[in-house]
Structure formats: C-alpha cells, structure tokens
Amino acid sequence: MEELEQGLLMQPWAWLQLAENSLLAKVFITKQGYALLVSDLQQVWHEQVDTSVVSQRAKELNKRLTAPPAAFLCHLDNLLRPLLKDAAHPSEATFSCDCVADALILRVRSELSGLPFYWNFHCMLASPSLVSQHLIRPLMGMSLALQCQVRELATLLHMKDLEIQDYQESGATLIRDRLKTEPFEENSFLEQFMIEKLPEACSIGDGKPFVMNLQDLYMAVTTQEVQVGQKHQGAGDPHTSNSASLQGIDSQCVNQPEQLVSSAPTLSAPEKESTGTSGPLQRPQLSKVKRKKPRGLFS
C-alpha cells in the first residue's frame, strides 16, 4: 500500500460543492485500489482499500453487475476526475454525503452499461499522523517557503532602490512623475500589511481560496517531503523511484476493458480507455530569470 500512500500525499486538494455542504478532497486511484482523504475543515476522514474490498463492496451494491475490480476502479476514476479536476465539466454521477458517528459516507450514483451503478466511500476519522502528513507539515512548509519568497522580494526591492539612487546621483531625472516611488521600507510595509491586508488575506472561508491559489506550492512541498523521505530510507534516486512507483491509474488502467456481465441476457459493456485521476506528476522546476536592462524611465 506504500504506492497509494505516497500517491495520495502528492495529489492536490480539490473543492467539492455538494448539496449538503462543501468539502476538500484528494484521491489517488490505481489498478490495485484507491486512497481518499476528505475534510470539512473541522475533521478529516480517510479511506484506503485494495482490490478485495472493491470486489466485495461492488457485489453488495451492484448485484446485477459483474466485473474485475480494476474495471470498477477505472469507472470510479472516470466519475471522480471531472469532480476533482475540472469543475467546468461536471461529473455524470450524483454525489451526496452523510456523517454517521465518526464516519463520513460519500455516496455515488451513476450508470454503467445502461444499468445503475452505486458506490459508497466509507471514510473513517483520519489518524493524527495522517493529518500531520497531509496538512500540518505541508502547510508549515508552505509558510516557510512563502516567508523565504517575501525576503527574496524585499532584497530585490532594496537592490532596485540602490539602482534608482545611482541613476539619480548621475543626474538622471524621472520623465513620468506618476512612476515615482519612495524607497522601500520593509518594516513599514509589514506593519501596514498586518493592519490593512491581513484580515482579507487570511479569510479561509470554505477552503476554496486555498484550493484555487496554492495547490502548485502544496504539491511542490509534498513532493519534496516524499523525496527527502526516500533519501532517508536509502531508496536510491528519488526521481527514479517516483517515476516508477507513482504512475497511478494512467499506466495501469489504459486500455483496461470493463468486461461487465449483467444478469440481463446478452448485455456487454464497451471497452473503455481511462486515464488516472492522478497522472504522472511534474516536479516543480526553478529556472533562472534573466534580468532585463532598464527601460529608460530616467533621462
């Protein structure tokens, strides 16, 4: 199950708007099973299953359908991908959720080969270590990365001020007065930000701003966490290990026929090609920015 655990960690969060409420969710599906993490910003629920659980649950919920577990997993991936990846193209399935004691049940209803298809994700409260792995540690890493970014930008602004000062000392004057700026004072800027911008900037709401604006950074931080963990475990080259182990359903379900057999006579399902909810992940790459020459604001 290590593949599912690492694959889930490196997935972005998605924002789900259901009839009952809104949720944050991430999922990783392969031919061997799936892992799902869901949160309403109050609690976090988790489910991770293998093919044996998929097969048993499919029999209980869909008595008229018979298929290998991989076919059901591919179908679930096809249903979840529009919901998690592209809100502009809604899923053909209907989703609803219920909270029962410490469990959250995410119910799915759709059609498969002309017959109703049902699925229930049975998510239990996530362990503290799982919450730390997927939320606390990544969010701390993101905060440190953003702080470092702010310091780099402040340094760049100071360098720009020195450059402008050098132009002025050389006798240059500003042609357009509207472009005039005061020297950057970091402490004053931070104090003003705390007073004027902080309330709006840290408005969490239902979690949608976090999902819409920060997932690239989130995935970069979690990818780094996985690579560091692999180095500590002596797993060899993390790039090689990641590309081999985190293919997900893209590599395992391509050209996977559903091979469905119904209790109704002469019913067969068309073959489908599916790609994974979590395809091959592109690691963030940093490129050097070529500094541009001044455009002659001064003459």
From Swiss-Prot:
Tissues expressed in: Ubiquitously expressed.
Coiled-coil portions: 128-170
MF annotations from Gene Ontology: DNA end binding; DNA polymerase binding
Consequence recorded when altering residue 132 to D: In XLF-Asp mutant; phospho-mimetic mutant; abolished ability to bridge DNA
Effect of residue 119 to A: Abolished ability to participate in V(D)J recombination
Organism superkingdom: Eukaryota
Effect seen on changing residue 64 to G: Does not affect ability to participate in V(D)J recombination
Name assigned to this protein: Non-homologous end-joining factor 1
Organism (species): Homo sapiens (Human)
